[in-house]
Amino acid sequence: MKIVLASNNPGKLAELQALLAPLGLELLSQAELGIPEAEEPFRTFVENALAKARHASRLSGLSALADDAGLCVDAFGGLPGVDTAFYATRFGYAKGDNNNVRALLEQMAHLTQPGQRRAALVSTLVAVRSADDPEPLIASGRVAGEIALQPVGSNGFGFDPVMFIPEFAQTFAQLPVSVKNANSHRGKATAQMIALLRERWL
C-alpha cells in the first residue's frame, strides 16, 4: 500500500519509514510527487496534521499520513508549540534546526534552577484514506524532559541535541537511533498509529 507523507522533512521521512517498516507500507514523501507544503493556520498539532494529510491526499490521490510535532516549554506557557519549525525566525535567525536550538538556548539562558527547564516533545500523527475521509486515524505521543544547557550528541535532528531525557540521563541525540525511535514522541505516536492501521485499514 502506498501512502504519501505530508512532509518535505528528510529526517521525519527517514524516521517514519523505519518505524512503519513492519507494516510493509511504501511511504513516499510529498516532495517526490511535487506536492507543495500545506498551510498550517491552526494553533493545535491535531488540526494542522489533519490539514496537511487532507492536502497531500487531495493532490496525490493516495492515502496520506501527516505528522505535526513540536516542542512545548513549560516556562514559555507551552510555546513554541505549533510554531516550533519557525522558532528561530522570531529572533532574527534563518529557519533551521541549528538556529532553533541556538535561539532556544539564548531565550532560556536565565533559567538555571532545577525544574525551570521542563519541556515536552509532542507528535500527532493523522492518516486519511482520502482527502474527504470522515474518520481519520489520530495518534499522539509525548515525551517529557528538560532542555540541556548546551547541545550534546550527534544523532537525530531538531531539538534532539538539547532534549535531555531523565530516564536515560542523556539527550535524544546521544541515544542510538533504535533506542531513540522506540522512546521518542514520534515513536510513541507511530506505535499507536501502527495499531490503528492494522485494526482499521490493513
UniProtKB/Swiss-Prot annotation:
Pfam families: Ham1p_like. The keyword Phosphoprotein does not apply. Mg(2+) binds at E39, D68. It catalyses: XTP + H2O = XMP + diphosphate + H(+); dITP + H2O = dIMP + diphosphate + H(+); ITP + H2O = IMP + diphosphate + H(+). GO terms for cellular component: cytosol. The keyword Metal-binding applies. Pyrophosphatase that catalyzes the hydrolysis of nucleoside triphosphates to their monophosphate derivatives, with a high preference for the non-canonical purine nucleotides XTP (xanthosine triphosphate), dITP (deoxyinosine triphosphate) and ITP. Seems to function as a house-cleaning enzyme that removes non-canonical purine nucleotides from the nucleotide pool, thus preventing their incorporation into DNA/RNA and avoiding chromosomal lesions. Homodimer. This is dITP/XTP pyrophosphatase.
